[in-house]
């Protein structure tokens, strides 16, 4: 059911009031009579109802309409108004809905075509913008892949170079470790040799001290002889010294009787042993003499 405009509702209320005025007794005024006599429009009780064509035309039985001069319309306007009312009644809409729908759909189709054209016009730059953005995205993706591939290759080359350097360093480390082992062995041998040399030096020092003592003793004996202490020695010691220094006659005679060849035949070992024994005897005698001099 179509919604009615306010003017139609007011018109129906006016017609309903007029129909009710015909049913009332003469001499009784309704609330809208003064308004009709003064030429004003009164909506009546405000009830909403739909009247048929006979009521609108005033031809219905017992429904005689009274139109004031101020509200009365010309015949042409009344005919046009009646035609408009017929078109807007629910009966006319229910009887012939096809022309109305076709009339309503015709401008809608035109408006739809216009909207489609406008949408296509709006979509065309959007589509172009979308294509451009898609192209940019694809190019960016390709460039990113290329850069990633180049970076992977660079990293692979760096990794291989580092691996070769590691292998080289490992070889150098092994060679240096071997050299360190050899050096440690040499150091150990040097330490051992140093200890041996130190012991040899100590032994030589002891020997040097012994030699110095012997030299001092010899010098002391020589000094005693030079100072004239020899006469102070006892006769016994002196005799012993003379007996030690003097040669026996038999030996002297023997030396006289010996020839040169026999003397040459004596071995140097025997001569060295005799000299050593002689030296020992001299040193012992000198020591005993010095002890007698300095008790």
Swiss-Prot record:
InterPro entries: bZIP, bZIP_sf, RISBZ3/4/5. SMART domains: BRLZ. Residues 162-176 are annotated as: Leucine-zipper. One of its GO terms (molecular function) is DNA binding. Residues 16-157 are annotated as: Disordered. Keywords: DNA-binding, Nucleus, Stress response, Transcription, Transcription regulation. Homodimer. Probable transcription factor that binds to the DNA specific sequence 5'-TGAGTCA-3' found in seed storage protein gene promoters. May function as a negative regulator in cold and drought stress responses. This is bZIP transcription factor RISBZ5. It comes from Oryza sativa subsp. japonica. The lineage of its organism: Eukaryota, Viridiplantae, Streptophyta, Embryophyta, Tracheophyta. The gene is RISBZ5.
